[in-house]
Amino acid sequence: MNWELLLWLLVLCALLLLLVQLLRFLRADGDLTLLWAEWQGRRPEWELTDMVVWVTGASSGIGEELAYQLSKLGVSLVLSARRVHELERVKRRCLENGNLKEKDILVLPLDLTDTGSHEAATKAVLQEFGRIDILVNNGGMSQRSLCMDTSLDVYRKLIELNYLGTVSLTKCVLPHMIERKQGKIVTVNSILGIISVPLSIGYCASKHALRGFFNGLRTELATYPGIIVSNICPGPVQSNIVENSLAGEVTKTIGNNGDQSHKMTTSRCVRLMLISMANDLKEVWISEQPFLLVTYLWQYMPTWAWWITNKMGKKRIENFKSGVDADSSYFKIFKTKHD
């Protein structure tokens, strides 16, 4: 036997396998652990049925789509946001298209910045359903403005809403979960809680704070293995988050979503979220390329990440100033459609 030829064949096979995996990664829309769970892990249809799930920010975007997909799993839903009429609209659609009855859905108006109301809201949920199995911290707001054009009040608002409001509600729900020694705290963070980009630095700061808080909380709860703390970090997703983003003042929003076709569909993002929840994953990254690649670089090769982020950041500012979506030009090479 020609051992040298065999060795070369093995090397060639290894290189081909590496190439195949690289091509698969370039078309991936989630981190490798999450995609493995999607392929081989537990199904949301098996794990989440009959649970009581409280979703904040449920009136639009990811929270709205999450309500629709959860309603098909037979959970009991608590829908919270500030706009009651929008919550009622979401509830009606859940009843029309899901597997729930009127008694299975509670519309509970909630302002995350009104931290004094969170204890009463928690008691209302417990009175209605007797328990809270999953708290999904999804409420929040983004920002689109350069630092020198932004009032300090904008940064204060983002911290109060995205960070302190979420922490406050979690602290109200947590004693109940500790008493039962089980529950899931799922926080919709962002890949901007891992990386940082121009135009959204106040938003980045609030999301970095959330990630630090919940990573630390997970360690504090190590003696309660039945309580799962999960960070969900989506990239650009089709929603109205840009339209509602704060501009340079707290009284001004962007007011225009622009073209959203280059972003991940909300339904795909939420499906991957449910897979993460079913498999008790501690942190997941849900994003198409190139943001997924950049997130990996920030985690494992930060020097390279700085170089790429500077290049992408300049283009992001150019896009914003020209009136198009700040992230619109990054997806042309990598864009993949997922049903």
Curated annotation (Swiss-Prot):
EC number: 1.1.1.-
Catalytic activity reported: all-trans-retinol + NADP(+) = all-trans-retinal + NADPH + H(+); 5alpha-androstane-3alpha,17beta-diol + NADP(+) = 17beta-hydroxy-5alpha-androstan-3-one + NADPH + H(+)
Active site: Y203 (proton acceptor)
Sites where the protein binds NAD(+): S60, I62, Y203, K207, S239
Subcellular locations according to the entry: Endoplasmic reticulum membrane
SUPFAM superfamilies listed in its UniProt record: NAD(P)-binding Rossmann-fold domains
Annotated Gene3D superfamilies: NAD(P)-binding Rossmann-like Domain (3.40.50.720)
GO cellular component, one term: membrane
Annotated tissue distribution: Found predominantly in the adrenal glands, liver, thyroid, prostate, small intestine, colon, stomach, kidney and brain. Lower levels observed in skeletal muscle, the lung and the spleen.
Signal peptide: 1-28
Classification via PROSITE patterns: ADH_SHORT
UniProt KW keywords: Endoplasmic reticulum, Membrane, NAD, NADP, Oxidoreductase, Signal
Binding site for substrate: S190
Gene Ontology terms, MF aspect: all-trans-retinol dehydrogenase (NADP+) activity; carbonyl reductase (NADPH) activity; oxidoreductase activity, acting on the CH-OH group of donors, NAD or NADP as acceptor
Highest taxon, organism lineage: Eukaryota
Function comment: NADPH-dependent oxidoreductase which catalyzes the reduction of a variety of compounds bearing carbonyl groups including steroids, retinoids and xenobiotics. Catalyzes the reduction/inactivation of 5alpha-dihydrotestosterone to 3alpha-androstanediol, with a possible role in the modulation of androgen receptor function. Involved in the reduction of all-trans-retinal to all-trans-retinol. Converts cortisone to 20beta-dihydrocortisone in vitro, although the physiological relevance of this activity is questionable.
Similarity comment text for this entry: Belongs to the short-chain dehydrogenases/reductases (SDR) family.
This protein's name: Dehydrogenase/reductase SDR family member 7
The species this protein was found in: Homo sapiens (Human)
Gene expressing this chain: DHRS7
